[in-house]
Amino acid sequence: MDKFRVQGPTRLSGEVTISGAKNAALPILFAALLAEEPVEIQNVPKLKDIDTTMKLLSQLGVKAERNGSVYLDASKVDIYCAPYELVKTMRASIWALGPLVARFGQGQVSLPGGCAIGARPVDLHITGLEQLGAEIKLEEGYVKASVDGRLKGAHIVMDKVSVGATVTIMSAATLATGTTVIENAAREPEIVDTANFLNTLGAKISGAGSDRITIEGVERLGGGVYRVLPDRIETGTFLVAGAISGGKVICRAAQPDTLDAVLAKLREAGAEIEVGDDWVSLDMHGKRPKAVSLRTAPHPGFPTDMQAQFSLLNLVAEGTGVITETIFENRFMHVPELARMGAHAEIESHTLICHGVEKLSSAQVMATDLRASASLVLAGCIAEGVTVVDRIYHIDRGYEHIEDKLIALGANIQRISGEE
């Protein structure tokens, strides 16, 4: 199992180029199952979850190849089951279900795996598809969906805001008869990107980015070329790298207007932030950040995927900051690892109270999930001595070449293969 060895402390400064957003690329790749003609998807990050998705699509009969862009041809799909072997590593595979039942009248997906951060039930996906007329059975660890003829448009009020279920319902509804309205829909930029992709193929979706999405069903979707939006979480992670180390970081090929809540908190922490159309810069002028308090919330609130990075920021900041996690359970698993490096914090249910310390010391630590692992690597960059971060397969699921980008900012980091 690979590890990172990080020598600190380092002031992280320089430029990084932001990759395409994993959280948009994944639903877009699955939504390509709806297309009867070839699609080209640009700016897809090179990540483990993307590779797994392409393997899964290939098993369903999609012609999938990568040559700069990702090229998918789902015109000859002849298998409608996403098997356990591939699904077990990645929760996103549930997104195959809606397109399969919408286009082919049947689909089955093994109950999924992925990061171990609390309950992420597939119930909302299932009830949404049932409201569109699908019959759902849970058998032998598989979710099986079927419909006679086509799905039927419906007025769906979601019990709670869910990015995953919004994607499932929106994708499936593109080929339903009649009009579907999703109330209490998720508003994330990645939802907007998925809708824009589907519209490029001939779907009729309006309102994405608001809490009410309307989908007028069409007979078929064709092909097209689409570019995935930049990764706002990767952008935020590298900005935090600059903030905790007193550095100056410029993120190129970014989309700052998807990051309002994060940029506001970085300014509150004392950072000087500048933005352009496709870049954002942070300058700490050598200062320590000030602690900030925040609550995670669905977009446009503060993203849960930036919570671990801001926990780290608070733990090395001046003062005390309180972070409340409202989206997922078990999302403070990085905190005991940071405590091994000298961080002071208390966890009270869904709240983390961070008491900033002037410096961290190196330690051997273990990644527990994707964003937690990023915070541990950044902690190693600013800690005194050599930090070893174990189980970095988590980080490879969501960050493209993170060590190369950190090296470009001046980090002293190397990947050690499990054998060494």
From Swiss-Prot:
What does the function comment of this entry state?
Answer: Cell wall formation. Adds enolpyruvyl to UDP-N-acetylglucosamine.
Question: Do you know which NCBIfam families this protein is assigned to?
Answer: murA, PRK09369.1
The EC designation for this entry is: 2.5.1.7
Concerning Gene3D superfamilies, the annotation shows: Enolpyruvate transferase domain (3.65.10.10)
Binding positions for UDP-N-acetyl-alpha-D-glucosamine per the UniProt entry: R91, R120, P121, V122, D123, L124, K160, V161, S162, V163, D305, I327
- Write out the residues that bind phosphoenolpyruvate: K22, N23
State the Gene Ontology terms under molecular function: UDP-N-acetylglucosamine 1-carboxyvinyltransferase activity
Return the similarity comment: Belongs to the EPSP synthase family. MurA subfamily.
Where is it predominantly found? cytoplasm
Write out the pathway annotation from the protein's UniProt entry: Cell wall biogenesis; peptidoglycan biosynthesis
Return the SUPFAM superfamilies for the record: EPT/RTPC-like
Any idea which UniProt keywords this protein has? Cell cycle, Cell division, Cell shape, Cell wall biogenesis/degradation, Cytoplasm, Peptidoglycan synthesis, Pyruvate, Transferase
Has the keyword Hydrolase been applied to this entry?
no
Source organism per UniProt: Erwinia tasmaniensis (strain DSM 17950 / CFBP 7177 / CIP 109463 / NCPPB 4357 / Et1/99)
Q: What is this protein called?
A: UDP-N-acetylglucosamine 1-carboxyvinyltransferase
Q: Which Pfam families match?
A: EPSP_synthase (PF00275)
Q: Name one GO cellular component term.
A: cytoplasm
Concerning InterPro entries, the annotation shows: Enolpyruvate_Tfrase_dom (IPR001986), Enolpyruvate_Tfrase_sf (IPR036968), MurA_subfamily (IPR050068), RNA3'P_cycl/enolpyr_Trfase_a/b (IPR013792), UDP_GlcNAc_COvinyl_MurA (IPR005750)
Q: Which reaction does it catalyse?
A: phosphoenolpyruvate + UDP-N-acetyl-alpha-D-glucosamine = UDP-N-acetyl-3-O-(1-carboxyvinyl)-alpha-D-glucosamine + phosphate
